[in-house]
């Protein structure tokens, strides 16, 4: 939902609804031993935690666009998501020599999130943008455990270029895109240290569909995840994706004079 409050100023809000189940299992196997009767004894411990979540989330945003001359413009934006504890039903099942099932009251939520960005546009053909976001996961309690996560930050840069808005050359209407990001994920090691950092580069094309306003997007992305602590794995990920954006006037009633 968005509202244009002034000529160049807009505000908006999003409402999201969460539902789903989370199951986490912890298992430990102890070394076997021989008792005084000569029997081999093996012990194990399995704890299963199940959570069913049903709740909502709110996002708020503001955007201001300042034209500069006839072909230039700068857009500033900011977003905010308030911290919110999610309604949930949680149980813990422990399996040793007997099975014990009990309900528990668990706290689990989403953090305060802040974001800001700036975009420069030239002649509706060149767009360059920078975004920064901060998610305060360090303030979130998970399964009644405080400080389970660390804050997540992300900075992204990107650009899109269209050679020509007019003309018959097909490749002149193709949208050429390039971007990159750097982020620090929110998960920790068992010692409470930040586990990894991540960065990626994306390149792609927006291919216009002939005699249509729809766009076919082809994208390739390289992602590098680096472990920051001893024993952590490094990951190299290569992704390819194809998508289509429909922008048709299906329900527009044509008029003939």
Go through the PLM ranges and name each one.
Residues 1-257:
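Outer-membrane beta-barrel porins/channels
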């Amino acid at each position: 939902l968005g509202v244009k409050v002034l000529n160049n100023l807009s505000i908006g809000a999003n409402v999201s609804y969460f539902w789903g189940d989370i199951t986490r299992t912890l298992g430990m196997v102890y070394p076997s031993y021989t008792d005084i009767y000569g029997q081999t004894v093996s012990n194990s411990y399995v704890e299963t935690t199940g959570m069913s979540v049903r709740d909502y989330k709110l996002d708020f945003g503001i955007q201001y666009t300042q034209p500069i001359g006839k072909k230039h413009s700068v857009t500033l934006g900011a977003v905010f998501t308030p911290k919110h504890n999610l309604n949930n039903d949680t149980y813990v099942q422990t399996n040793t020599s007997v099975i014990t099932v009990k309900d528990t009251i668990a706290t689990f939520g989403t953090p305060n999130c802040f974001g800001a960005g700036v975009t420069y546009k030239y002649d509706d053909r060149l767009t360059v943008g920078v975004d920064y976001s901060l998610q305060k996961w360090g303030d979130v309690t998970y399964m009644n455990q405080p400080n389970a996560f660390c804050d997540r930050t992300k900075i992204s840069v990107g650009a899109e270029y269209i050679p020509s808005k007019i003309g018959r050359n097909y490749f002149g209407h193709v949208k050429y895109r390039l971007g990159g990001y750097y982020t620090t994920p929110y998960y920790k090691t068992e010692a409470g240290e930040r586990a990894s950092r991540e960065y990626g580069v994306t390149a792609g094309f927006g291919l216009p569909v002939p005699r249509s306003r729809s766009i076919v997007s082809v994208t390739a992305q390289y992602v590098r995840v680096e472990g920051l602590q001893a024993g952590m794995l490094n990951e190299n990920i290569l992704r390819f994706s194809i998508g289509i954006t429909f922008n048709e006037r299906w329900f527009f009633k044509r008029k003939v004079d």
